[in-house]
A protein has these predicted regions:
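Non-catalytic DNA-recognition/assembly elements of restriction-modification systems
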Residues: 1-19, 140-143
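Sequence-specific dsDNA recognition surfaces
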Residues: 9-59
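A short beta-sheet element
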Residues: 56, 60-111, 131
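Short amphipathic beta-strand starts and helix->beta connectors
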Residues: 75, 120-123
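A short glycine-rich beta-alpha junction/loop motif
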Residues: 82-87, 122-143
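Periplasmic-binding protein-like
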Residues: 113-116
Length: 143
């Protein structure tokens, strides 16, 4: 590991909050441009209670990297809470004093991160960059 670099998994944690009482109605997706975008899914007749809630200040990413134009779909929510498909992984920075979430999003926005995520993806038909691989990312964490 490079000097000054830290393992990301020491700073983040999974979040799995479901929309059980249907309190959140804003449905979004995550684009390869690393932003939350309005969902284009047809949700007529869909049970939204199993969708995941993303709270302001949390991240979401799509672990499937196949056919994403060599990019990973990951975004930081800096607006009101939303719901996303349960196929996304939601996580947050445990201690914002140790790692600024906006700094982390800058790191995720680098082309080097996309290349790393694609390289570390596994699978034959559906390549996956899973939670364990994300946690092993090494990045410089400023003091």
């Amino acid at each position: 590991m490079e000097k000054g670099y830290k393992i990301l998994g020491n700073y983040i944690r999974l979040v799995d909050e479901r929309n059980k009482n249907l309190a959140v109605t804003k449905l979004l997706g995550v684009s390869i441009s690393k932003k939350f975008i309005p969902s284009i899914a047809n949700i007529v007749g869909t049970d939204l209670s199993n969708y995941k809630i993303v709270r302001t200040g949390q991240f979401a990413y799509g672990p499937v990297t196949s056919r994403n134009g060599e990019k990973i779909s990951i975004a930081y929510l800096d607006e009101e809470d939303c719901i996303i498909s349960s196929s996304y992984t939601v996580f947050e920075v445990e201690n914002k004093e140790e790692l600024d979430p906006e700094y982390l999003m800058l790191w995720f926005s680098r082309p080097e991160f996309d290349r790393y995520a694609r390289y570390k993806s596994h699978g034959s038909v559906r390549e996956i960059f899973d939670w364990n691989e994300l946690c092993m990312v090494e990045l410089p964490v400023p003091d």
